[in-house]
Amino acid sequence: MPYSFFKYIILINFLTGACSGPKQAYTVRELINGKFKADSSYIYSIPFKTGKNVFVIQGYETSFSHKGERALDFKVKTGTLVCAAREGIVTSVRKDSDKGGLKPEYLSEGNYVIIRHADSSTAWYWHFKKDGVLVNEGDMVTDGQPIGYSGNTGYSAFPHLHFEVQGRDAAGNYKQLATRFYTREGAIYLRPLRFYRTRR
């Protein structure tokens, strides 16, 4: 059995846990079970080309590497076009790394893009391939604009895109936020181990 496939099977076995985290207007368990209240939060686009089917390999609070985190991992091939999930201004990028793996020293080696939105929240996109970032600091980007090509740099077991949004919660604290996305089923919170089709 190829080692990469073995790692993938191990990861699947970890992706079943979901524990409650700090409240926004709901708990993570409520999100994962599809039980949440009426919500007025911003609706994001899944960060890929419109019409693409993508697989969410890790969701909020899943136990492989997202325990305590409100972040999503999309399992995609290296070189998959990544698009902005919301318009904003690019505040930071890295594009020169070619290092990746599960060693602690790779935690700071991922290529990334950070985009600040009109409400001061920021979207973080991680693990782009070397020289695969298409934007620069200070660029204005629109929803759906290409920003780079996915890869496997940084702390990563396989090619994927790590996506998270950070902003103010109901108490005014700056932290990771669970976010809704446009899908064929409407505006929903994405759940792990499911396919979704990108739409805008």
Task: Specify the residue positions occupied by each region the protein language model found.
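C-terminal motif of bacterial Sec signal peptides marking the signal peptidase cleavage site
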Residues: T16-A18
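Acidic, glycine-rich catalytic/binding loops that coordinate metals and/or anionic ligands
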Residues: T27, I32-N33, Y42-Y44, D139-T142, ...
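Short histidine-centered loop motifs in beta-beta connectors
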Residues: S121-G144
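Surface-exposed, glycine-biased beta-strand/turn segments
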Residues: S20-G110, R191-R200
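A structural signal for short beta-strand/turn segments enriched in small hydrophobics and glycine
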Residues: V82, G88-V90, G138-S150
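A residue-level detector for short acidic-glycine micro-motifs
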Residues: Q58, S92, H127-K130, Y149-N152, ...
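Flexible, gly/ser-rich surface segments that form the specificity/activation loops bordering the active-site cleft
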Residues: V93-E105, Q145-L161
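Sec-dependent signal peptide recognition
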Residues: P2-L11
